[in-house]
């Protein structure tokens, strides 16, 4: 049975994969994540998830390699990590009363036989109408400077939302586990069977 590799150094993706209680290792993929001018958000995350998984194939020749990538889209534009408090407040002002869509690309690459499975999972976040004081307090308390969209749904960010819409809540954090389990079963690795 091939061993499992997570092509990521993200502590959030690692924590999500640990939920499945299967043995895996993490490795940093080497991929240029620059969007191409003609790519839609869906195409971008699908390409990057695939490239991340396949970039580790030579180092891990007999493994199942998981690649994942995510973008946050508001008003048709990709919203990145804010990096500053002012940018975080600006992103949250734009999101207030709107729907922010996250697209998460998932790839499972079997480096032993070259079989590749891919999927893109959308997830919609419906924001409440937020006043300036709420935005300021949230940014001060949560410091979401390294989170696309300027919030952490798994933390205090839940207070910002009216509702969440998607097949798998794990998708919002960065790794769609339901889709991954389906892919793993197709490769003969059922998480329920160890």
UniProtKB/Swiss-Prot annotation:
The active site is at 69 (proton acceptor). Pfam families: Maf. The record marks 12, 70, 154 as: Important for substrate specificity. The keyword Cytoplasm applies. GO terms for cellular component: cytoplasm. Its cofactor is a divalent metal cation. GO terms for molecular function: nucleoside triphosphate diphosphatase activity. Keywords: Cytoplasm, Hydrolase, Nucleotide metabolism. Its EC number is 3.6.1.-. It is an enzyme of class 3 (hydrolase). It comes from the Bacteria. Belongs to the Maf family. YceF subfamily. NCBIfam families: maf. This is 7-methyl-GTP pyrophosphatase. It comes from Shigella boydii serotype 4 (strain Sb227).
């Amino acid at each position: 049975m091939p061993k499992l590799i997570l092509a990521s150094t993200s502590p959030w993706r690692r924590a999500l994969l640990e939920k499945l209680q299967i043995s895996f290792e993490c490795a940093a993929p080497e991929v240029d994540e620059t969007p191409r001018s003609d790519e839609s958000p869906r195409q971008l995350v699908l390409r990057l998830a695939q490239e991340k998984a396949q970039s580790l194939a030579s180092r891990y020749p007999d493994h199942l390699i998981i690649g994942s990538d995510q973008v946050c889209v508001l008003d048709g534009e990709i919203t990145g990590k804010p990096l500053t408090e002012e940018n975080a407040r600006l992103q949250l002002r734009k999101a207030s009363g709107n729907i922010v869509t996250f697209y998460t690309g998932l790839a499972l690459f079997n480096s032993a036989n070259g079989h590749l499975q891919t999927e893109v999972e959308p997830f919609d976040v419906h924001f409440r109408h937020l006043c300036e004081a709420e935005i300021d307090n949230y940014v001060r308390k949560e410091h979401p400077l390294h989170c696309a969209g300027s919030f952490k749904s798994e933390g205090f960010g839940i207070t910002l939302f009216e509702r969440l819409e998607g097949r798998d809540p794990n998708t919002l954090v960065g790794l769609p586990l339901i889709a991954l389990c389906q892919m793993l079963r197709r490769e003969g690795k059922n998480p329920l069977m160890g």
